[in-house]
């Protein structure tokens, strides 16, 4: 399974995504761009299971997780065997 995780600029530093993640792929890092002075880090996508709990927990739609199963990806690219 491969994952593409998009991070947008609307993080408010609430830590909801970090607390929701069952595999701890996110962490908060210092950032001066919001009141909380922290932002969710880029996730370790190799450990992401694609459950989208972080996305569901986010109150500002900061995270977008797209999960592609290998056979679906190859089929959509015309590479299915």
From Swiss-Prot:
- Any GO MF annotation of the entry: electron transfer activity
In this chain the 4Fe-4S ferredoxin-type domain maps to 2-31, 39-68
Where does the secretion signal sit in this chain?
A: none
Task: Please list the residues that bind [4Fe-4S] cluster 2.
Answer: 21, 48, 51, 54
| Entry function | Apoprotein for the two 4Fe-4S centers FA and FB of photosystem I (PSI); essential for photochemical activity. FB is the terminal electron acceptor of PSI, donating electrons to ferredoxin. The C-terminus interacts with PsaA/B/D and helps assemble the protein into the PSI complex. Required for binding of PsaD and PsaE to PSI. PSI is a plastocyanin-ferredoxin oxidoreductase, converting photonic excitation into a charge separation, which transfers an electron from the donor P700 chlorophyll pair to the spectroscopically characterized acceptors A0, A1, FX, FA and FB in turn.
Q: How does it assemble?
A: The eukaryotic PSI reaction center is composed of at least 11 subunits.
> Can you say what this protein is called?
Photosystem I iron-sulfur center
- Source organism per entry reads Spinacia oleracea (Spinach)
Chain's gene name: psaC
């Amino acid at each position: 399974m491969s994952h593409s995780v998009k991070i947008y600029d609307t993080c408010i530093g609430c830590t909801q995504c970090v607390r929701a993640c069952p595999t701890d792929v996110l962490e908060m890092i210092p950032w001066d761009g919001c009141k909380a002075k922290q932002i969710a880090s880029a996730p370790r996508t190799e450990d992401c299971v694609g459950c989208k709990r972080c996305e569901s927990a986010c109150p500002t739609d900061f995270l977008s997780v797209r999960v592609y199963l290998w056979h679906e990806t190859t089929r959509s690219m015309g590479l299915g065997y």
